[in-house]
Amino acid sequence: MSETLMEQCRLREQHKRRNACIAAIVTVVLVLAVAGGVWWTAGDGSALVRNMFKPKATPATQPVVNSTAAFAYRTAPEFLAMETGDRDTGNVNYSPASMWMALAIAAQGANGTTRSQLNELLGSGSLADSDYQSLLSSINGQYSGAKSEMSAANSLWIDNDYSLASDYQSTVKKMFEAEVTTLPFDDQAAAKMSDWIAKHTNGSLKPKITLRDREVLSIINTVYADGRWKDPFEEQSTGNGTFHGEAGDAQVPMMHRTFSQMAYGHDEYNTWQRVEIPFDNGGNLAIVLPAEGHFDELAGDAEKLSWAFGTCSTASLGEGAMGCAADSMPGWGVSVNSVMVNVTLPRFTIDSMFDSEATIKAFEKLGVTDAFSAGDADFTKMIDTGSHGENLYIGSILQGTRIEVNEAGAKAMSFTKVGADSVSAPVDNVEFTVDRPFLYSYVTPDGIPLFIGAVRNLGGVGGEN
């Protein structure tokens, strides 16, 4: 992953103007969702033990929830349509929360039009320092009585020939609790960055990092979440069933469970249905099942995607239910109820790698252009250039992810690398059978989408799964 990113960075050096290359490993996200009992991670230590030493979680403010959710739905159609190298299945796993945090950290060092374009995309122009801080407090806190765990960490690494601007350093420490390390950018620095990532993902992720010429800064963000199903699927209830994928039918393991009370929603024309499979901390894995012939219509339209995933569902479950990312959205004839639901859901695994060039083009399409231009980018608030006289710009953005969903839960990890060169009530019992292409979102208790994905093919049809 890192070599691909740095090659992108090297290509940017062909510009006539001399530009510093900031290779920013901006996001490493690991989400582990399992059910019941004490579950030990690959890196040793249990979530229960770690949770004992955490402060009580406090909710993220509504402004930052709204900003991250809006960014997720606005950008998701671009990423869900990308070729990600997942063995040609067409399946995609995207982490909008990772991308948001990465770009938000970079935006603090931007000025002028570069900053305003990033703020517009992120929805962060009116956010206060306390809003950013609340996001970390929500993710890093302990939820009473829950075995689920989430954590986020940030760090900035700068070559010792350079120095962070003092105001920028103060800002990222205050708002993102970022660690700052100054060191020679050599192989030892790369190894230390990899070790830091492993430490903050509980040993579960340790990417190989290669530092190339002209890199002067790396930004690393990790997010870890171990969400336990509130009501786990039973392995003995799993049996083979047919998944009608875009590329053809396949026999795949189908999990089954009856939920006595579950948030279930659909639109008035039944072009989609949604269930929210809860974790024990108030978060959930939302599954949106488009009607036949409506998958592309939904996955490719930001407003419709937001409508399907963002419709407030907690109102019908009582005031004690947590979070609602888009409670001010129009209902558009949507019915949301708490009912008994028989869920049939396939096990699946997705590996995604988002091409840097395609990612940059997507953001340019969404209005962020100056940040990627050697001539127009303004990141003068990020470093003290001193005698270097170099201009900085974002030369590459790379995100790699993995998600596994089975009887135990949803286990996912993502790796984002940003390189900067220089209506009617349903029946009482609902059958929700996911046997055709579907969409999903891993949502925090506050309603922040950590992952949004699309499953188009399973069982080796269109590729391995």
List the predicted regions and their residue ranges.
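Extracytoplasmic/secreted cell-surface and envelope-processing proteins
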Residues: G112-L118, H294-L298, S352-D355, M413-S414, ...
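Non-catalytic, conformational "gating/processing" segments within enzyme and secreted inhibitor domains
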Residues: T89, S130-A291, A326-S424
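Internal alpha/beta scaffold segment
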Residues: P290-N337
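Short Gly/aromatic-enriched secondary-structure transition segments
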Residues: L118-L122, F233-T242, D296-A308
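A short, polar/proline- and glycine-enriched secondary-structure boundary/capping micro-motif
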Residues: M262-G265, D296-D301, S424-A425, V461-N465
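Detector for small/aliphatic-rich hydrophobic stretches
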Residues: S2-C9, A20-F185
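Short, positively charged
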Residues: V65-P77, A410-N429, G463-N465
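Extended hydrophobic
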Residues: I219, T271-P290, A425-N465
